[in-house]
Amino acid sequence: MKNNLKETLQTVASGLESAKVTNFPTNWESFNEVNEETFCNQLVDPWGRHGLSCLKNVKGTHARHKKINDMIQVAISVSGTPAETEPRGLDKEDGKQPDGWTLYPWTIGLLLMWDYTCRDTLAASNVLGCSKEAGSAAMAAEDIKRKKYSELAKENHFIPIAQETFGSWGPSGLELLKEIGTRTIIASGNKRARANLFQNISMAMIRGNIINVKSTLPPLNKNQELLFLNSIISPLFDTHYGLESK
C-alpha cells in the first residue's frame, strides 16, 4: 500500500489541485495500532482509507454530495443564470434525475444539466490507474455519467462533474466549473470568485473525507480525538496559508 500511496501522491497533482490545499494527513503514525474491523466487516488499517470508499459508511459522502451541489447551484445563479438542484418536471420514465439544472438556457439555447460524483483515489479499483495518470478515476466516472444520462443529453447541455478524494477533476467538470467561475467574476466583479468556488468545493470534499475516515475508527478518548483532528487540520491550514515548514 505504501508504494501505491507514494506513486499516487506523486502523480495526483493535475489542473487546479493547488486550489484544494493539500489534504492528506501527515501524522498518521499516531494511529499505527488501529487494525480493527468496521461495522461492514472490513479491516481498517492505520491509513484509514477504507472509509473513503465504504458503501455502508456514507455520512460524509451524502453530506459532501449535497453541500457541493448546493455550492454549484449558488455559483451558477450568481453568474446570472437561475438554477436549482433536484430538478422537477423532468420526464423520468427511466428513473434518472441529474443533480441540478438551469431554469434558463446556458449555451446555444440549451439548459445546463449537471451531475456530481466523487470517487476514492485509493479504492482498490482506482489506485493503480490513478498512480499512473492523475484523475483517471474521475475521467472514468464522467464517462459513466454520460452513458447514464445519454437520453437527457439529447435535448439538454449535460455535463458530468467528477472529482476524486485526492482532489483530481475530470476534464469536463473542470472546464464547466472554470466557466461558471469566469461568469461569476463578470457578474459580481469579484476577481477571486473562481478561486473561491474551487477552494470551497475542495474544503467540502476534505470535510467529507474526514467524516468518512473518522467513522471507521474505534472509539477515541478526548486526547486521541484532538490528536486525530490536529493531524488532519494542521496540514490544511499550514499549506493554505503558506506556513508549511521549509
Predicted segments, located by residue:
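Non-catalytic C-terminal interaction segments of nucleic acid-processing enzymes
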Residues: M1-L43, K59-G60, V74, V78, ...
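Short Cys/His-based metal-binding microdomains
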Residues: E37-I68
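Short, conserved catalytic/metal-binding micro-motifs enriched in Asp/Glu and His
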Residues: W47-C54, D99, W114, P160
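Two-metal-ion RNase H-like nuclease active-site motif
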Residues: E86-R88, D99
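Conserved beta-strand/loop block within the catalytic cores
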Residues: G95-Y104
